[in-house]
Swiss-Prot record:
Pfam families: Anoct_dimer (PF16178), Anoctamin (PF04547)
Quaternary structure (record): Interacts with KCNT1/Slack.
GO cellular component, one term: plasma membrane
InterPro entries per UniProt: Anoct_dimer (IPR032394), Anoctamin (IPR007632), Anoctamin_TM (IPR049452)
Protein name per its UniProtKB record: Anoctamin-3
Family: Belongs to the anoctamin family.
Renumbered residue ranges of the record's region Disordered: 1-32, 67-87
Chain's role: Has calcium-dependent phospholipid scramblase activity; scrambles phosphatidylcholine and galactosylceramide. Does not exhibit calcium-activated chloride channel (CaCC) activity. Seems to act as potassium channel regulator and may inhibit pain signaling; can facilitate KCNT1/Slack channel activity by promoting its full single-channel conductance at very low sodium concentrations and by increasing its sodium sensitivity.
Membrane-crossing segments per the record: 404-424, 470-490, 551-571, 593-613, 641-661, 762-782, 811-831, 915-935
A Gene Ontology BP annotation from the UniProt entry: calcium activated phosphatidylcholine scrambling
Highest taxon of the lineage: Eukaryota
Biased composition (Basic and acidic residues): 76-87
Length: 981
């Protein structure tokens, strides 16, 4: 409701509010328009915060214009104050908060740099003297958290007031003094306040504490279009929503009878975030009085303040020259050794959180999220977002969603595995292999290999059946549908989060050019069609040339990976005969398993070694392209890293799945590599066991290695840093910024490694799931640990990363969708080619006892093993033996008219395989497309709410502008109009 009578001053006097000096001055005139900036309105509904925010900003401006007003702090009345102002000022009710805000003008025009600059006066004594002399009738008490925050020694400047927003670190012995000096002078010229302080543990280390004052904060918040709250949200319900609410209330009553879900967090333990329940709009200094500013020190969150400071650091020059700009270049050339925002305090407390509450948000995150004892609890996403920023918040939201969706996939995969385990002894194929004591298999190598009884493969046949049974096709279809459902519902979840976190249309508002791009192409400018302003432009010819060079580098690295896989294949061929003649009987009997196991370990070592080179090459190629924005740089770098890692990780698996044992020839005419090494054959029970072994070992070892590098390595480094400090000083005397410096920095590429690890795992879980149904279960167990491991790492082991914003998970969503498509194709080929599902199917309905419905009471796969093995005359091998040996293939026997040629059954199986691939792909793709069509990316209710709020925001803008003009007319004595001018 809008009030059209009285003024702000009279309204505040009626409510008993304080009136600041700045409210007595005449407000700057505005020229409102219906086409002015949206969302910049505030009515009498928040008149208290309105007048307070106006006074905060205007007092800063007035004090900067008249420095002599600082003498108002003395007991005597200043001479330049008029009698009318003196009369009004004498009625003010002074409070500690008002005085603290006013005292910010002290030293505003002063450059804060030297260590001793803030030691010239005792601020607390000054405040106490003033409060004692004036003896205000009432005081605004600070909250417990505010008092602990002000008293903390590691979060403020030496004056005990100015908050530390960013930390720069350098060494005194570094020779880049001129660059640092120029850079720091330019920072002060931009409005930042700096304060130096040496490290306690190492005097050679110097810290520069950076504080961004209110006026500079407002200027850059307006420039960056930072959205801030300006009015509480008002919700509406139509008849349809009312009916829904009745149903929801009914279910709520039922839930009350049931026990509380142990996975749900206790909401009373978390602070309410005011901005999540307010309409927001881009900040504007001209209309600062419209916003809800209860406290200007907390109006912009810590994350926003740090983000604005980093924006300034990245665009400040340190030398003459267009490219000599940015803190990252200064860190690269050694001028500074680190730059980071500080943590909000210690993450542990001697006082229990249940009785004394959290000391700070970091402490709260540790107790309610990062501790291992909270592994079964939901994540406090709003608090994560508030502390680490939206980008990291979205990562943990996606990781939690992915982990939750793995539960049904793991359950179904486990059921398929248990089905194979229960029916393993009933398998007709396994029974025939285990009973084939008189069937001899042809030697699998030319030297040191002898004839082998078929029943020696009994164990391998049973293990193969665990992963290759009747549920394999069903599980492959299920996982393809699961991948689609997971991605579609994540899009809905993401849209809800972007709305809740006020990220709708954020990218168009805040995306800026990279300094490197601006420095490279500053001479070639074009008019931006959106902003209408000139900006640097990269010519198309230059862009295409750089992309061609980058693509060439990518193909070179992929060819290097393929070469490494080929080397492992050669190794398998060389050591195959060596293991067959090994001295140890166990290795000699299981030489194929030993060959595969050793090859897997060597392949894993090669994967880890190549990973070290991939990151540097991808970084070099991405910088060579000169991406326009940070998001483009991240997407390009992430795509290269994914391609390198995906090929590196899966190339050996693709070889085993689709090439191992496919082109070996037949006894007497084997194909050889370089006319020397005979190609490797599959085990008598099939190649699927080799594929399972390869996937299981790589997945298990890689997850252990990643977890160690993510947590174990930082733990060791941080322990060593603390150990060196404890030699000469106590931990209690170390300030927060030095404790943060002793932590490990976050990876320079941000969340890329975290996403890459999970996306590669998603590929393992979906692409070859037909061969390894336990992959979702292993992924689920790993992710339960991964969430708390990452949380513990972010909260306790890493310096606080820059709180960046993002609307989605970036290019990773497109990569996940591509993996989902590739998974359908790959599983179709795995079922059709790698497994024996199609040969069994053809035998069952064409060549077996049940063909043409002749014998319906017998097992339809009876005789399948004998049918799938071909004959070869041993006399042709020159081994001095007679008789026949068997081998896996569909070729004619030696006594046929066309010996060792493919039989008709081979061509039937080949046709069935191709037909299955086509039918499977079309069926699954059709189901995936239908499901994607049924599930909209944005829920209908959310879409309606967004449209409703846009309408309300525009109406509020008109209403508040009218109200502000009426206030102006009341002050000037002009007539009031109750309609829009």
């Amino acid at each position: 409701m809008v009030h059209h009578s009285g003024s702000i001053q009279s309204f505040k006097q009626q409510k008993g509010m304080n009136i600041s000096k700045s409210e007595i001055t005449t407000e700057a005139s505005l020229k409102p328009s219906r086409r002015s900036l949206p969302c910049l309105a505030q009515s009498y509904a928040h008149s208290k915060s309105l007048s307070q925010s106006a006074s905060l900003f205007q007092s800063t401006e007035s004090e900067s214009q008249a420095p002599t007003s600082v003498t108002f702090l003395s007991a005597d009345k200043p001479e330049h104050v008029t009698s009318e102002e003196s009369r009004k000022d004498s009625t003010l009710k002074c409070s500690f908060a008002d005085l603290s805000d006013f005292c910010l003008a002290l030293g505003k025009d002063k450059d804060y740099l030297d260590e001793s600059e803030h030691a010239n006066y005792d601020r607390s004594r000054l405040l106490n003297d003033f409060v004692t002399k004036d003896k205000p009738a009432s005081k605004t008490k600070l909250s417990k958290n505010d008092m602990s925050y002000i008293a903390s020694s590691g979060l403020l400047f030496k004056d005990g007031k100015k908050r530390i927003d960013y930390i720069l670190v350098y060494r005194k012995t570094n020779i880049q003094y001129d660059k640092r000096n120029t850079f720091e002078k330019n920072l002060r010229a931009e409005g930042l306040m700096l304060e130096k302080e040496p490290a306690i543990a190492n005097p050679d280390i110097m810290f520069i504490k950076i504080h961004i004052p209110w006026d500079t904060l407002c200027k850059y918040a307006e420039r960056l279009n930072i959205r801030v709250p300006f009015r509480k949200k008002c919700y509406y319900t139509d008849q349809k929503n009312k009916s829904k609410s009745r149903v929801q209330n009914y279910f709520k009553r039922i839930k009350k009878w049931m026990s509380q879900n142990p996975m749900v967090l206790d909401k009373s333990a978390f602070p309410e975030l005011e901005e999540s329940d307010c309409y927001t709009g881009p900040f504007s200094r001209a209309r600062i009085h419209h916003f809800i500013i209860n406290n200007k020190d907390t109006f912009f969150s810590n994350a926003t303040r740090s983000r604005i400071v980093y924006h300034m650091l990245e665009r400040t020059k340190y030398e003459n020259g267009i490219s000599k700009v940015g803190i990252r270049k200064l860190i690269t050339n050694g001028s500074y050794i680190a730059a980071f925002p500080p943590h909000e305090g210690a993450y542990k407390s001697s006082l229990p959180i249940k009785t004394h509450g959290p000391q700070n948000n970091r402490h709260l995150l540790y107790e309610r999220w990062a501790r291992w004892g909270m592994w079964y609890k939901h994540q406090p996403l709003d608090l994560i977002r508030m502390y680490f920023g939206e980008k990291i918040g979205l990562y943990f939201a996606w990781l939690g969603w992915y982990t939750g969706m793995l539960i049904p996939a793991a359950v179904v995969g486990l059921c398929v595995f248990f089905y194979g385990l229960v029916t393993m002894n009933e398998s007709q194929v396994s029974q025939e292999i285990c009973k084939a004591t008189e069937v001899f298999m042809c030697p699998l190598c030319d030297k040191n290999c002898s004839l082998q009884r078929l029943n020696d493969s009994c164990i391998y046949a049973k293990v193969t059946y665990l992963f290759d049974n009747g549920g394999t096709v069903f599980f492959a279809i299920f996982m393809a549908i699961w991948a689609t459902v997971f991605l579609e519902f994540w899009k809905r979840r993401r849209s809800i989060l972007t709305y809740t976190w006020d990220l709708i249309e954020w990218e168009e508002e805040e995306e800026t050019l990279r300094p490197q791009f601006e420095a490279k192409y500053y001479r070639m400018e074009v008019i931006n069609p959106i902003t209408g302003k000139p900006e640097p432009h990269q010519p198309s010819s230059d862009k295409v040339t750089r992309l061609l060079v980058s693509v060439s580098g990518i193909f070179f690295m992929i060819s290097l990976v393929i070469t490494a896989v080929f080397a492992v294949v050669v190794y398998r061929l060389v050591v195959m005969e060596q293991f067959a003649s090994f001295k140890w009987n166990f290795v000699k009997q299981h030489w194929q398993f030993a060959t595969s196991g050793a090859a897997v370990c060597i392949n894993f070592i090669i994967i880890m070694l190549l990973n070290l080179a991939y990151e540097k090459i991808a970084y070099l190629l991405t910088n060579l392209e000169y991406p326009r924005t940070e998001s483009e740089w991240e997407n390009s770098f992430a795509l290269k890293m994914f391609l390198f890692q995906f090929v590196n990780l899966n190339s050996s698996i693709f070889y085993i799945a689709f090439f191992l044992g496919r082109f070996v020839g037949h006894p007497g005419k084997y194909n050889k590599l370089f006319e020397r090494w005979r190609l490797e054959e599959c085990h008598p029970s099939g190649c699927l066991i080799d594929l399972c072994l390869q996937m299981g070992v790589i997945m298990f070892l890689k997850q252990i290695w990643n977890n160690f590098m993510e947590l174990g390595y930082p733990l060791i480094q941080n322990w060593w840093s603390r150990h060196k400090i404890k030699r000469g000083i106590q931990d209690a005397s170390i300030p927060q910024w030095e404790n943060d410096w002793n932590l490990q920095p976050m990876n320079i590429h941000g969340l890329m490694d975290e996403y890459l690890e999970m996306v590669l795992q998603f590929g393992f879980t979906t692409i070859f799931v037909a061969a390894f149904p336990l992959a979702p279960l292993l992924a689920l167990l790993n992710n339960i640990i991964e969430i708390r491991l990452d949380a513990y790492k972010f909260v306790t082991q890493w310096r606080r990363p820059l709180p960046a914003r993002a609307t989605d998970i970036g290019i990773w969503l497109g990569i996940l969708e591509g993996i989902g498509i590739l998974a359908v194709i790959t599983n179709a080929f795995v079922i059709a080619i790698t497994s024996d599902y199609i040969p069994r199917f053809v035998y069952e309905y064409k060549y077996g006892p049940c063909a043409n419905h002749v014998k319906q009471n017998e097992n339809c796969l009876k005789g399948y093993v004998n049918n799938s093995l071909s004959f070869f005359d041993l006399s042709e091998l020159g081994m001095g033996k007679s008789g026949y040996c068997r081998y896996r293939d569909y070729r004619g026997p030696p006594w046929s008219s066309k010996p060792y040629e493919f039989t008709l059954q081979y061509w039937h199986i080949l046709a069935a395989r191709l037909a299955f691939i086509i039918v499977f792909e079309h069926l699954v793709f059709g189901i995936k497309s239908f499901i994607a069509y049924l599930i909209p990316d944005i829920p209908k209710g959310l879409r309606e709410r967004i449209r409703r709020e846009k309408y309300l925001v525009q109406e509020m803008m008109y209403e508040a502008e009218l109200e502000h003009l009426q206030q102006q007319r009341r002050k000037s004595g002009q007539p009031i109009h109750h309609e829009w001018p």
